[in-house]
């Protein structure tokens, strides 16, 4: 019986190792001719190695700068861009991408290194147009690790992390303690990158987050005490954008750049 149980356990681990993309990423696919419901954005795809990323750009006259937005692990740009009122309020443009296999983006996610390379390519496609103006790197959930890694290599004026993780390995350990963390091919070590970030950092995290516990944000804040850390009372993981405290704090911080 012990041998059988061991064989089953080993088989499950092998399956998890090779199929973990299906456990980490939950894209919504869109047809290539899909028309986005938000009318005041333009499509601006980004060519990357072996694929093309769907991206949306909201631009307004005399913008103060740009919010470079990296979203979470589910949905598509159709769900992530529901309006531009916040950006009009703060005077900032928006540039947001769908990862490979999300929305209208082609290809599929194959490695963490590939994701970082894609994010950097997207950055290089837009950032030069905002030279001399303020740029905000914004990461939400999955996007927080990607944004933090990018922030170690580029010049911007603020890094915003919404519902961040110390690492995806730590998140996996929270939910699947029986799985050896070394098997995760997407460790996304925010805890290693954040101390290397030179720009100001704002962290907002829901106190009731049931997906990425607030302990992750607390750990990051302890690593870099100079970060501004805001606990969102009564807020879970998927309702952050509905929090008045979140919207007001973000608008204040970005608007004062």
Placement of each model-derived feature along the sequence:
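Catalytic histidine-centered segment of alpha/beta-hydrolase-like enzymes
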Residues: 235-245
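Membrane-embedded segments
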Residues: 52-125, 133
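Short beta-strand/loop motif that positions the catalytic acidic residue
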Residues: 197-198, 203-205, 209
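Active-site nucleophile loop of the alpha/beta-hydrolase fold
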Residues: 156, 160-170, 186, 190, ...
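An N-terminal hydrophobic leader/cap segment in hydrolases
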Residues: 5-47
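Alpha/beta-hydrolase fold nucleophile elbow
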Residues: 130-141
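Conserved alpha/beta-hydrolase "acid-adjacent" motif
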Residues: 210-216
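Catalytic active-site module of serine/aspartate enzymes centered on a nucleophile-bearing elbow/loop
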Residues: 243-257
């Amino acid at each position: 019986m012990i041998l059988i149980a061991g064989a089953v356990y080993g088989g499950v681990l092998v399956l998890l190792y090779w199929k973990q993309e299906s456990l980490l990423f939950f894209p919504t696919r869109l047809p290539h001719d899909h028309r986005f419901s938000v009318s005041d954005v333009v499509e601006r795809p980004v060519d990357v190695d072996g694929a093309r990323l769907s991206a949306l750009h909201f631009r307004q006259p005399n913008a103060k700068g740009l919010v470079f937005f990296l979203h979470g692990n589910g949905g598509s740009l159709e769900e992530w861009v529901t309006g531009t009122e916040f950006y009009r309020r703060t005077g900032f443009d928006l540039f947001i991408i769908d990862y490979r296999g999300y929305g209208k983006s082609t290809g599929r996610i194959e490695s963490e290194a590939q994701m970082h390379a894609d994010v950097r390519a997207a950055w290089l496609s837009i950032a030069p147009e905002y030279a001399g103006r303020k740029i905000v790197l914004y990461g939400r959930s999955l996007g927080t690790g990607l944004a933090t890694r990018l922030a170690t290599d580029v010049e911007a004026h603020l890094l915003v992390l919404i519902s961040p993780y110390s690492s995806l390995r730590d998140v996996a350990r929270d939910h699947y303690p029986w799985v050896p963390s070394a098997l995760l091919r997407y460790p996304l070590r925010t805890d290693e990158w954040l101390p290397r970030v030179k720009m100001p950092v704002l962290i907002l995290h829901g106190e009731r987050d049931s997906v990425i516990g607030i302990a992750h944000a607390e750990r990051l804040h302890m690593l870099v005490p100079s970060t501004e850390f805001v606990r969102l009372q009564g807020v879970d993981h998927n309702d952050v954008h509905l929090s008045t405290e979140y919207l007001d704090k973000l608008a204040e911080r970005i608007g004062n750049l």
